[in-house]
Amino acid sequence: MEDIPTMVKVDRGESQILSCRGRRCGLKVLGYVTGDMKEFANWLKDKPVVLQFMDWILRGISQVVFVSNPISGILILAGLLVQNPWWALCGCVGTVVSTLTALLLSQDRSAIAAGLQGYNATLVGILMAVFSDKGDYFWWLIFPVSAMSMTCPVFSSALSSLFSKWDLPVFTLPFNMALSLYLSATGHYNTFFPSKLFMPVSSVPNITWSELSALELLKSLPVGVGQIYGCDNPWTGAIFLCAILLSSPLMCLHAAIGSLLGVIAGLSLAAPFKDIYSGLWGFNSSLACIAIGGMFMALTWQTHLLALACALFTAYFGACMTHLMAAVHLPACTWSFCLATLLFLLLTTENPNIYRMPLSKVTYSEENRIFYLQNKKRVVDSPL
């Protein structure tokens, strides 16, 4: 009878050990699929080139939102298929062609492997399909999509050479340049490849504040994130947020906050409700909030506030760019995000808590913060 309590204690101890091991195993597995999946990339190095190439393409698709994670790329591709399979196909074609062009031009292999030579062409392919006046499955569009995607590595390499003097990223400037060139060359009245007609505002919008819908405003938050890829389906935007969350919860949080600030900016300028509901006020500010809030600046409460300011500034600047670009019958694209965020990254300050990450060390928000804290500790511990 005296042995029974002892056996119970032993069983409880074993169950606690097994439970701890299970948790550790779960965390280890989670570590392999979150962040930038560096271990997976290392594992692929001696595998067939086809598998490596698929990894590069998926990372390129996800790099639009600063994520280098193939599983996130699969989720984003699934979201694009939910929105429109034709857009997804054009985006994939653009990514593949751009990556192959970068290989032919002997661009940095590590940048190609991280998807940095594919993401601009992802947007080029998708947005050329979105703005095509021929509708879906106009197969001839594949040719200009491929041609313009080939220019993206050229623009990226040239801009990188220029921006490297200040250790700045090129963001989506190659996409903006390629798409603007294409739409300027073709336009709405082109016989072969007509695009949608972009016109400046010519009358005062009819705003009735009593018709403002709280539900539509709530839906506009994921839609704002979805519009980064030109998508207006809230389910697609929600999938994109999940893809970002898988890689970095901090980046997902800032993506949602940025979209919210874009909505607030739109309401403060009495923008047409349909523009706010469709996410057109949220996507640039969402990207800006991610970029400053932990991606290219280490996350502290100071840089978090700076990210909020940058997101609001980007949203208002986006309205300015929309009017300016409409005057020449072009969409605003992500010009406001690129220009506003570069402006904030060039900010100089003596505050050590506003720390811009060296471009070669940028990974994802959580890892960037660890690098910043370790660097800060080394500075404190080093002798004078």
From Swiss-Prot:
What is the protein's membrane topology class? Multi-pass membrane protein
Where located? Answer: Cell membrane; Basolateral cell membrane
Kindly give the Gene3D superfamilies that the UniProt entry links to this protein. Answer: Ammonium transporter AmtB like domains
What domain of life is recorded for the organism? Eukaryota
The protein's predominant localisation is membrane
- KW Nucleotidyltransferase (keyword) present: no
Keyword Coiled coil set for record: no
Q: Which InterPro entries match?
A: Ammonium/urea_transptr (IPR029020), Urea_transporter (IPR004937)
Recorded catalytic reaction(s): these are:
urea(in) = urea(out)
What is one GO biological process annotated to this record?
water transport
Q: Which GO terms describe its molecular function?
A: urea channel activity; urea transmembrane transporter activity; water transmembrane transporter activity
Q: Which UniProt keywords apply?
A: Cell membrane, Glycoprotein, Membrane, Transmembrane, Transmembrane helix, Transport
Q: In which tissues is it expressed?
A: Expressed in brain, spleen, kidney, testis and lung, with highest levels in brain.
Q: Per the record, where is site Important for channel permeability?
A: 334
What protein family does this chain belong to?
Answer: Belongs to the urea transporter family.
Please give the subunit comment from the record: Homotrimer; each subunit contains a pore through which urea permeates. Identified in a complex with STOM.
Sum up the protein's function in the record's words.
Mediates the transport of urea driven by a concentration gradient across the cell membrane. Mediates the transport of urea across the cell membranes of erythrocytes and the renal inner medullary collecting duct which is critical to the urinary concentrating mechanism. Facilitates water transport in erythrocytes.
Put simply, this protein is called Urea transporter 1
